Amino acid sequence: MFEKRPRLFKNRDVLSPLFVPDTLQDRKEEVGAISQYLGYILDGATPPHLLIVGPPGSGKTVTTKYVINELEKHTSDAVIEYIVADGTAYQVATSIARAPRRGLGFLNIVEKIRERASEGKMIIVMDEIDKTLSRDGDKLLYHLSREPNVCIVGLSNKLTVMDMIGDSGVISSFKPRRISFAPYSAPQLEEILNYRVEMAFNDGVLEDDVVPLCAALAAQRNGDARYALDLLSFAADIAIRQLKGVVSESDVRMATDEVEVEFIRRSIEQLRDNQKILLYAVMTSHGGTPTEIYRKYNKMTEEQFGGNALTQRRLSQLLRELELYGLVEIEVVGRGRGRGVNWHVVPSSSIDPELMLEAIRRSL
């Protein structure tokens, strides 16, 4: 069974978006900016809050982790916590405090974070900070941004993430330095892939046009390095499945469909059931106003899924969350001079609707 399996990989894990390389290509300016601010901790000072924004796959997470890894080589006094902040304020707080998720109130959890911060200066990296802000994350930022020993580093795909903060008290205390990441260009993506290829693959197993093609296709997807890495990884999987000793251009083109399916699977996996049903309502109605979606959601919930109806306010919040995940698009349509605007919700134009509907059906 395994004897005939081609040995293409030296280390497949290198192609994972979770892998943090020893050096970074084409992000020297951003590395310099982040390290300049966080470096104040080496002088005994609390670094200023940071907000790092840019499109998906632009290197925000890997660059921040790289700087953090380097910082930890120079200090043992700092308390550094990295979390994906995609839950409620309470859930995010328990992750930061490393506390159990039951039995303690929110303010008790905040007090435990204060205790951790009292051990030294504390840097809290909150990846996908927009996700918790779309829920009740203001509440947590209110407390953390007022702690003299705490530096918050927020990462977001949403350029207007600060507009999500509705509490004026938070706005006055959380005034981050902003660092923006531009999408990668095709040459930059090619450089990133070539660096990883040396560590990931055995010699001579990629045809010459494989890396340039992956880079070009990813550049068309808003310069998404994760997409480029997924394409290369999936193309190699296809070659192995077909018992080929070399990855070809045709494998890359076949991989585009598999990467799309995997993206949809991951997207659905992170949703709660009410979000899945709401997305299903948007997809099957081909869009509509929030009121129209609201009626369809409640009808579907009662007739097909046996769940509970939502208030229109809660549904609007869920629609905003789906927009943050890149699964729906919310268009603002004018009603004429002096008559205000309407929302119009449509499925994301970048996602295959049939694949998405099938994935939702399987998950419910």
Swiss-Prot record:
GO MF assignments: ATP binding; ATP hydrolysis activity
NCBIfam families for the chain: orc1/cdc6 family replication initiation protein
Domain of life: Archaea
Pfam entry (one): AAA_22
Family under the similarity heading: Belongs to the CDC6/cdc18 family.
Function noted in UniProt: Involved in regulation of DNA replication.
InterPro entries (alphabetical): AAA+_ATPase (IPR003593), AAA_22 (IPR049945), Cdc6_C (IPR015163), Cdc6_lid (IPR055237), ORC1/CDC6 (IPR050311), Orc1/Cdc6_arc (IPR014277), P-loop_NTPase (IPR027417), WH-like_DNA-bd_sf (IPR036388)
Organism (species): Methanothermobacter thermautotrophicus
Keyword ATP-binding belongs to the record: yes
Keyword Cell inner membrane included in the entry's annotation: no
Protein's recorded name: ORC1-type DNA replication protein
